[in-house]
C-alpha cells in the first residue's frame, strides 16, 4: 500500500450539488429557487431584510457616536520598552521618539504619536520624546532616572482668531 493508493471510504465525503444541470439531476430548471419572485431572480437579496418584520438593526437602540476630534495614539507600555532594551533592539543613548519605538516594533499605527503607559517595570534611564504619557508612566520614568518630553500645545485656530481680535481692539 502506498500513500497515493489510499482513498476515502465510499460516502465519507458527500459531493457538492451542481444546480441547474437538467431535470435528471433533481436540482435542474429552477435550481431549488422555486417559482418566480425576487428570490428566484439573479442578484443578491436585500441584506438585513427580515420579510417585513422589524429588522434587528432597527430593533436595537442607537448608541454612541464617532468623535471626529478623537486622538489616535499608539499605546506603549513601559514593561515592553524595557524588554526591547534588554534584547538590544532599542538604542537609549539618545532620545527615544515615535520613530525609534516604531523601528523596535513597539508602536503600531498611532497617527497622532505615542502615549506611554505605566504597565510593567522600567529600570533603564531613558529620555523619551512622545505625544503623551500617563501619570504613572511619568513617575516610573523619573524614578528610573529618565525624562519625558511632551510637545508644546499649539493654539487652535479659534484661539489665534481671538488673540487677533484682542490685538485689533487695543489699536
UniProtKB/Swiss-Prot annotation:
> GO biological process annotations for this chain's record?
translation
What are the UniProt keywords, alphabetically? Ribonucleoprotein, Ribosomal protein, RNA-binding, rRNA-binding
Gene Ontology molecular function terms on file: rRNA binding; structural constituent of ribosome
Q: Where is the composition biased (Gly residues)?
A: 21-35
Pfam families, per this entry?
Ribosomal_L27A
Skewed-composition ranges (Basic and acidic residues)? 157-171
State where composition is biased (Polar residues): 1-10
Its Gene Ontology cellular component terms are: cytosolic large ribosomal subunit
The ranges of region (Disordered) come to: 1-44, 150-171
Domain of life, per the record? Answer: Bacteria
Give disulfide pairs as residue numbers. none
State the function annotated in the UniProt record.
Binds to the 23S rRNA.
The record's listing under NCBIfam families reads: rplO_bact
Subunit composition?
Part of the 50S ribosomal subunit.
The similarity comment for this entry is: Belongs to the universal ribosomal protein uL15 family.
Q: What is this protein called?
A: Large ribosomal subunit protein uL15
Amino acid at each position: 500500500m502506498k500513500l497515493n493508493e489510499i482513498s476515502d471510504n465510499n460516502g465519507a465525503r458527500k459531493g457538492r450539488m451542481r444546480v441547474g444541470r437538467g431535470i435528471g439531476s433533481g436540482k435542474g430548471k429552477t435550481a431549488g429557487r422555486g417559482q418566480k419572485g425576487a428570490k428566484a431572480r439573479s442578484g443578491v437579496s436585500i441584506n438585513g431584510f427580515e420579510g417585513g418584520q422589524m429588522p434587528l438593526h432597527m430593533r436595537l437602540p442607537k448608541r454612541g457616536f464617532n468623535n471626529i476630534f478623537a486622538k489616535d495614539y499608539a499605546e506603549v507600555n513601559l514593561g515592553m520598552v524595557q524588554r526591547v532594551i534588554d534584547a538590544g533592539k532599542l538604542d537609549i543613548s539618545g532620545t527615544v521618539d515615535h520613530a525609534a519605538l516604531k523601528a523596535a516594533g513597539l508602536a503600531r499605527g498611532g497617527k497622532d504619536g505615542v502615549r506611554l503607559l505605566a504597565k510593567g517595570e522600567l529600570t533603564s534611564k531613558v529620555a523619551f520624546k512622545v505625544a503623551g504619557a500617563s501619570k504613572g508612566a511619568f513617575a516610573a520614568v523619573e524614578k528610573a532616572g529618565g525624562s519625558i518630553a511632551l510637545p508644546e500645545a499649539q493654539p487652535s485656530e479659534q484661539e489665534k482668531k481671538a488673540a487677533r481680535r484682542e490685538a485689533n481692539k487695543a489699536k
